[in-house]
Amino acid sequence: MPFTLGQRWISDTESELGLGTVVAVDARTVTLLFPSTGENRLYARSDSPVTRVMFNPGDTITSHDGWQMQVEEVKEENGLLTYIGTRLDTEESGVALREVFLDSKLVFSKPQDRLFAGQIDRMDRFALRYRARKYSSEQFRMPYSGLRGQRTSLIPHQLNIAHDVGRRHAPRVLLADEVGLGKTIEAGMILHQQLLSGAAERVLIIVPETLQHQWLVEMLRRFNLRFALFDDERYAEAQHDAYNPFDTEQLVICSLDFARRSKQRLEHLCEAEWDLLVVDEAHHLVWSEDAPSREYQAIEQLAEHVPGVLLLTATPEQLGMESHFARLRLLDPNRFHDFAQFVEEQKNYRPVADAVAMLLAGNKLSNDELNMLGEMIGEQDIEPLLQAANSDSEDAQSARQELVSMLMDRHGTSRVLFRNTRNGVKGFPKRELHTIKLPLPTQYQTAIKVSGIMGARKSAEDRARDMLYPERIYQEFEGDNATWWNFDPRVEWLMGYLTSHRSQKVLVICAKAATALQLEQVLREREGIRAAVFHEGMSIIERDRAAAWFAEEDTGAQVLLCSEIGSEGRNFQFASHMVMFDLPFNPDLLEQRIGRLDRIGQAHDIQIHVPYLEKTAQSVLVRWYHEGLDAFEHTCPTGRTIYDSVYNDLINYLASPDQTEGFDDLIKNCREQHEALKAQLEQGRDRLLEIHSNGGEKAQALAESIEEQDDDTNLIAFAMNLFDIIGINQDDRGDNMIVLTPSDHMLVPDFPGLSEDGITITFDREVALAREDTQFITWEHPLIRNGLDLILSGDTGSSTISLLKNKALPVGTLLVELIYVVEAQAPKQLQLNRFLPPTPVRMLLDKNGNNLAAQVEFETFNRQLNAVNRHTGSKLVNAVQQDVHAILQLGEAQIEKSARALIDAARNEADEKLSAELSRLEALRAVNPNIRDDELTAIESNRQQVMESLDQAGWRLDALRLIVVTHQ
C-alpha cells in the first residue's frame, strides 16, 4: 500500500478509534496516530487492516475546527488530498481543506460511506438487519398489536374489553367484572396496549396497601411492565433527586392511604402529568352528595388532572345505585352531575335491555317494541332493518345482530362501563367442599382456657382472631419453638391425605407464614413429601422459583404451602386440590383463596378440603361460610354486605365458640339474606351491557386470531438469529424452554432484560402460563423489542460485501442490493406506525439500473452468497467504487416512485379510518351523551397531525450489499 505522511486512514477492526493520521513510514511498517483517542497503532505495510479515507464530490465533511463544507472537487498532490467546496456556515465558495485538517472524530453513518471507508459488516448481520426491518414493519401493521405479548390465557371477554378500550384516546372507563373474571388482567392489557403504541407513557396505579405487591407482580410477570412501588421511604429518597419525587419514575404504584395522607404528596401526584390513572377496589371510595370521603376526594382530584382513568370495582348491582353513580361521576363529572337524573335514565334503559333479550332469543317483537327500538336507535332509515329482524327470512338473524350492535353503541353507559358475570362467561369449574371435623387436642383446650382467663380484657374481635388459630395461642404460652404439630390432628390428616394422593398437586393455604414454614419441615422430615413454601418474607424471584418447582409435572413439588399475603396475585390453575389449613377472617379473603385455583381455564372441578377443630372458632366459621353464605361452592357477591350486617354477632360467636345458642338462627337469617340479595342482583342484571362487555362471536374470533399468531415460526428463527448475533448464549432445556445467558463477546456489555444469571424463555404460551420463572417471548416482549432497537438504531449490518458463484454470469459482474426505508417522523402518541411504520423497500440493481428484486427473493438469494473477509472486501470496494457510485445514483432515481406509492397508500388509509371513526362518534354523540367532547376533539386533532406528518414522510438508504460474481 502507498502510504504518505499526513494521509488519513481508518482501522477496519477498530472503527471506534476514529480517523487516523500516518505519522511514520518505513520499509516494512506504518504508524498511525488516532487523535480522537490519543492512541498509536503500528501496522505491517504489506497487509495492514486499514482503509484509505477518500471523500467524493457531493459529500459533506467536517474540519477539525468544527465547520462543515460540501465537497465540489478533490485534488491529489504527492499522495495527499485537498477538498475544495462551499462552507455550510458562511456559504463561502472555493474553500480548500487539506485532509490532514479533517475532524478526527469522524463517524460514517451512511451505508455507502461505511462501505467505502472499509467498515464492512458480516453478511449475516446484513441479513438480520433486513429481516428486522421487515418483521418490525409487519408487526406494526398486524391486527391486535399490544394484545399478543402478555403472559395470559386468551380469554375472549378480556380481549374484547382490552381491544375496545386500549385503542381509545385517554380512555375513562369502569371495569366492573365479577370476581375471578380478571379485571386486573383487563387493566394490564389496556396499559400494555397504550404504552406499546405510545398513546400513554406515564401511568399511576393506586390500590389498597395489601394489594400493592400483587399488582407489582402481575404487571411484571404478565405484561413485562416494571413499576416502581412508592411508599414513605421511597418518596423521601426521591425528594433528593427531583422537585417532584414522582417525576423520577414513569410507572408508579402506591397505596390509596399513601396518596391521601399528605396534602403535599397529593399535590405532587396531581402535578406529575400522568397519562393514565388506575384505581383498584374503587368501590371502597365512600361518597354521598353531602359528605364524600377524603379517599374519594383524593381520587376525584387526581381524576381531574389525568386524561385517562380506569376504575376497577365491584359489579354495579353489588354497589347500589348511588355508589355506582359516584364511580361514573369520577370518570365524567360533566355527564354524571345529577344523581336523580341518572336514576331516571337508568329506568329508561330497562325496556331496551328487555327488547335486546327478545332479539337474541329470536322471539317476534310486538309493534310497541318495534316502535320503541326505532325511537331508541333514532336512524331515519331503520324501518327496513326492523322489518327484516322480525321476519322469517334468512336475513333475520344478521338483522337482529346489527340492531343489537346499534343499541349497544347508543346504550347509556356502555362506553364507560364494562361488566361481565360468571353467568355470561363460560369455562368455570365446579367447586366441591369436603369438611373434615377433628377433635380438639387437650393441649389446645388448656391453652385456650388459660388464654381466656389472661385475655379477659381483650376486645371480642381480638379474642375472635386468636381463637381462629389455636396453634398460635399454644405457642404464646409454650414459646415459638413449641412442637404443636406433634399433636395437632390437622397435621396428621394432611400427611395422610397427601401420601394417599401422591399424583395430585395440592395447594395448602394458611394465614401465617410461620405456619407454612413449620408444615413444610414436618412434611419433609416425616414423610419425605416435596413441598415448596410461598410467603411474604420471600423475594419475587424466590416466589417464582417456588411456583415453578410446584408447576413441574414429574420432578416438581407435590405441595405448595402458601401464607395468606404471600399468595396474593398468584394463580395455580394447573392444580385442582386445595387444603385450607385454617380459615380467613372475612368472605373476601376466602374468595381470594379459592380464586387461586378457580379461574377461567381451570380444567378440573376444584376440591376444597377444610380440616377444622371442633369447639373452636374454626367450627363456627366453616358453618357460617358454608351454610350461611354458600361461599365455598359458589362465588359470593353478597358476602361482604352480610358480613358487615352481622359482624358484631359473628365476632361474639367466634370469640366464644362454646356458646352457640342462637347461632342456628343467625345462619338461617344470613342464608335468607343471601338468597334475597342474590335474586335482587340477578334481577338487576343488564343483559345489553353484558353482551357489549362479553363481545360474543367477535371476541371469540379475536382470541382465535391471536392464537394463530402464537404459532409464528418466523419469530423463533429470527429470535435465535438475533441472540446469536448479539452474542447471547442459548442452552436448550427441553420442554420448549431455552436458557439465555450473557457471553463475553456481546455487541453491548449489558443487554436490557438479560441478567448476569441469565433467564429462561419459552415461545409456548401454555408453558409460560404453567411456569412463572419462564418468560414468554413474542414480538412484543422487551427482549425482542430491545434487540430490534439495538440492531436498527445503530449501523449493525448496514454495509457488506458478498460473492455470488454463478457461471451463467461473467466474472466480476456487479450487483448492488439496496434497502431503503420509507418513514415519517412524528410524536409517538400519534401512533403513525398504524399507517406507515418504517417500511423497507428492497432493490437489487445491476450496472444498468435493472431492478431484479421481484425475480430474486431475498432469502433464496442470501443462501446462494458467500462471505468475504473485511480486508479482501475493502480491496474489492476500492476497485469498483466508481461503478458502485453510478449504481447508487440509479437507485436514487428509482426509489421515489415506490416510496411515493407507500406514502399515498398510508395517507388514504389514515384519512379513511380516522375520518370514519370521527363521523361514527359524531353521529352517536346525538343519541349517546357518554361520548366526551374532548374525545371527539382529540380524534380530529390526531387526524390533522397524522395527515401533516404523512405529508412530510420521506425515505433514506438504510443498508446496502455489494455482490461480485465469481466462478471459483
From Swiss-Prot:
Natural source organism: Escherichia coli O1:K1 / APEC
SUPFAM superfamilies assigned to the protein according to its UniProt record, in alphabetical order: P-loop containing nucleoside triphosphate hydrolases
Chain ranges of the Helicase ATP-binding domain: 164-334
Pfam families: Helicase_C (PF00271), RapA_C (PF12137), SNF2-rel_dom (PF00176), Tudor_1_RapA (PF18339), Tudor_RapA (PF18337)
GO molecular function: ATP binding; DNA binding; helicase activity; hydrolase activity, acting on acid anhydrides
Quaternary structure annotation from Swiss-Prot or TrEMBL: Interacts with the RNAP. Has a higher affinity for the core RNAP than for the holoenzyme. Its ATPase activity is stimulated by binding to RNAP.
Class of the enzyme per the UniProt entry, highest EC level: hydrolase
Domain of life per record: Bacteria
Entry binding sites for ATP: 177-184
EC number: 3.6.4.-
Protein name: RNA polymerase-associated protein RapA
Listed Gene3D superfamilies: 2.30.30.140, 2.30.30.930, 3.30.360.80, 6.10.140.1500, 6.10.140.2230, P-loop containing nucleotide triphosphate hydrolases, Tandem AAA-ATPase domain
